[in-house]
């Protein structure tokens, strides 16, 4: 995991051969959907695990089966996930595999294909979300419009920037800059930063529409 100074609170997974191999598979348009899902889930799990590393902890002692004391840590506070629908829902299982019985809220924000502006359609969040650490889920960070819209909603509901950790699979430099300029204290954990955006606002080299491929609605 490395911090990206030029983008503020941005943390990128170590670019190991394993991670590069996983991305080679999910970026390959000739691969079947089943392989995309399997290997995308592996990347998502890595991102979630790293996101959890950014939660506050306090020291804790337990007694082992050998009647020996072990000094460890326990997480402070409660968490919840918030997926930016629909693609963000692909990351929910990875979060549930790491955090049993975690509460997950949903925000539906769709991008206008002509203006590329985000439009809010649906929201359902835990009533006590302002008292929780929020893992915001969306696999692709392109322009950052949808992410910023979701973050504004969370802030308006009483969440502090420091409580929000944004998890995504692929980010663009433009999206990272836009999010950081608007919310400099929100941490972002991503698996990789791609080259940039094309004229249509899509990430390149990217992998296409993550949600369409994952949920089987690719044309």
Swiss-Prot record:
One of its GO terms (biological process) is uracil salvage. InterPro entries: PRibTrfase_dom, PRTase-like. Its EC number is 2.4.2.9. Uracil binds at residues 203, 208-210. 5-phospho-alpha-D-ribose 1-diphosphate binds at residues 86, 111, 138-146, 209. Gene3D superfamilies: 3.40.50.2020. Binds 1 Mg(2+) ion per subunit. The magnesium is bound as Mg-PRPP. NCBIfam families: PRK00129.1 (NF001097). This is Uracil phosphoribosyltransferase 1. It comes from Schizosaccharomyces pombe (strain 972 / ATCC 24843).
């Amino acid at each position: 995991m490395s911090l990206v100074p030029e983008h503020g609170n941005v943390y990128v997974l170590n670019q190991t051969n394993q991670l590069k191999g996983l991305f080679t598979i999910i970026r390959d348009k000739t691969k079947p959907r089943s392989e995309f899902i399997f290997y995308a889930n592996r990347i998502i799990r890595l991102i979630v695990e790293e996101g959890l590393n950014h939660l506050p902890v306090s020291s804790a002692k337990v007694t082992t089966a050998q009647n020996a004391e072990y000094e460890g840590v326990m997480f402070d506070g409660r968490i919840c996930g918030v997926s930016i629908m629909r693609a963000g829902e692909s990351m929910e299982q990875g979060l549930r595999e790491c955090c049993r019985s975690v509460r997950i809220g949903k925000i539906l924000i769709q991008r206008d294909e002509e203006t590329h502006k985000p439009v809010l359609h649906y929201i359902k969040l835990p009533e006590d979300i302002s008292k929780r650490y929020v893992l915001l889920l969306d696999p692709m960070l392109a322009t950052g419009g949808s992410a910023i819209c979701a973050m504004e909603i969370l802030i308006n509901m009483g969440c502090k920037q420091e409580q929000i950790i944004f998890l995504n699979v692929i980010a663009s430099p433009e999206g990272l800059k836009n999010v950081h300029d608007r919310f400099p204290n929100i941490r972002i954990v991503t698996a990789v930063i791609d080259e940039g955006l094309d004229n249509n606002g899509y990430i390149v080299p990217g992998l296409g529409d993550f949600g369409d491929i994952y949920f089987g609605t690719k044309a």
